[in-house]
Amino acid sequence: MDAWSRSLERLEAEFPPEDVHTWLKPLQADLRVDSLVLYAPNAFIVDQVRELYLARIRELLAHFAGFSDVFLEIGSRPRPVEAQNAPFSTPSAHVSSEPQVPFAGNLDNHYTFANFVEGRSNQLGLAAAFQAAQKPGDRAHNPLLLYGGTGLGKTHLMFAAGNAMRQANPGAKVLYLRSEQFFSAMIRALQEKTMDQFKRQFQQVDALLIDDIQFFAGKDRTQEEFFHTFNALFDGKQQIILTCDRYPREVEGLEARLKSRLAWGLSVAIEPPDFETRAAIVLAKARERGAEIPDDVAFLIAKKMRSNVRDLEGALNTLTARANFTGRAITTEFAQETLRDLLRAQQQAISIPNIQKTVADYYGLQIKDLLSKRRTRSLARPRQVAMALTKELTEHSLPEIGDAFAGRDHTTVLHACRQIRTLMEADGKLREDWDKLIRKLSE
């Protein structure tokens, strides 16, 4: 039994079984030589573990392993793959080496177009990824860049495209990497003086998929090598699919020539899902798990959890885990009881003061400007946007929103909401502002 298993056994004896099942059992452990990395499915579990259990985990680890360094991360533990099938090595950020990555084995075949839930927020991204999979290398979508906040489905679409390419052509060399893996592989090649081999290995793929290219910012040599890799693949009509947490031109430290290359193909924003899409996602994920979730429970989660798909999944995991443990049916009352802290945290994260500050900062204003009685266009439009965002992202009533904006009447708030919705249909810049603000508030 390893140090983490022994620590977990002790924690099970010290804490209520229900708490252990909800907060500690979902953790995936990666025990290193002198540290432990715990992967959690969502940020809420990370916060709970950090606040309630981390100090005790460190004490137990020091006792059983002789060290107490513990790192909490969101995601899944890296899965080992067979080194003999690999074209090159890609060490992770935490260890000096990692099993090599094969062309086929590093695509997660769970993520397909069939189980991707389509909505207004991701419709264009889905269509673009599907076209890239159908016609890889076509200049209309090469490179394909999917950008947006965390947990919105960018990686799902990337995997779906890669899996579709391999389904159509089982011999296709489709390589998926996180950006830090590209960086680590390059560093190793530099150290071992095997850069020529490094370049050949990347340039022989049929499709290159790289996640989170914002990680390249400020890394000049990495950007240079990726720039040359990009050019070789593009000239060879090999498909490139990338993701970024924002539009690349907004990433400081990314070279102008690389930003220019990324604009050659198709860039698509993936936005936070709307209510209907969120509800559909909850129901779809529940079906995948074989769980029976009433529609009203899905609607409750969708109404309260507005930020991203990952948080929706986290809420669903917490709900189903407690239901399985207690044997209770999943009802609205059970969901409200189980998710009370999670829902409260969501409400606190997106508050009226937070919205006002975010909008004011975005437009280069002071909060007092948004609350003032002045009606100049430079103030009136941001004020309307702030009120509309508050209606969209919080549970506050129109009168409450009006009160928060210097005592304005509820009809003023209603007019602002309708006005912004109407204007966004025709004003692309306003729509872009709205989407960017949604992303900022959902991070």
Curated annotation (Swiss-Prot):
InterPro entries from the UniProt entry: AAA+_ATPase, Chromosome_initiator_DnaA, Chromosome_initiator_DnaA-like, Chromosome_initiator_DnaA_CS, DnaA_C, DnaA_dom, DnaA_N_dom, DnaA_N_sf
Annotated localization: Cytoplasm
Annotated spans, Domain IV, binds dsDNA: 324-443
Gene Ontology cellular-component annotations: cytoplasm; plasma membrane
Keywords annotated in UniProt: ATP-binding, Cytoplasm, DNA replication, DNA-binding, Lipid-binding, Nucleotide-binding
Gene3D superfamilies in UniProt: 1.10.1750.10, 1.10.8.60, 3.30.300.180, P-loop containing nucleotide triphosphate hydrolases
Magnesium among keywords: no
One Pfam family per UniProt: Bac_DnaA
One GO BP annotation of this record: regulation of DNA replication
Region of interest: Domain I, interacts with DnaA modulators: 1-67
Binding site for ATP: G151, G153, K154, T155
UniProt superkingdom: Bacteria
Region ranges (Domain II): 67-105
Chain residue ranges for the region called Domain III, AAA+ region: 106-323
Molecular functions per Gene Ontology: ATP binding; ATP hydrolysis activity; DNA replication origin binding; lipid binding
Family (UniProt): Belongs to the DnaA family.
Domain free text: Domain I is involved in oligomerization and binding regulators, domain II is flexibile and of varying length in different bacteria, domain III forms the AAA+ region, while domain IV binds dsDNA.
PANTHER family tied to this protein: CHROMOSOMAL REPLICATION INITIATOR PROTEIN DNAA
Function: Plays an essential role in the initiation and regulation of chromosomal replication. ATP-DnaA binds to the origin of replication (oriC) to initiate formation of the DNA replication initiation complex once per cell cycle. Binds the DnaA box (a 9 base pair repeat at the origin) and separates the double-stranded (ds)DNA. Forms a right-handed helical filament on oriC DNA; dsDNA binds to the exterior of the filament while single-stranded (ss)DNA is stabiized in the filament's interior.
HAMAP family registered for this protein in UniProt: DnaA_bact
Assembly and interaction partners: Oligomerizes as a right-handed, spiral filament on DNA at oriC.
Protein name as annotated: Chromosomal replication initiator protein DnaA
Organism: Stenotrophomonas maltophilia (strain R551-3)
Gene: dnaA
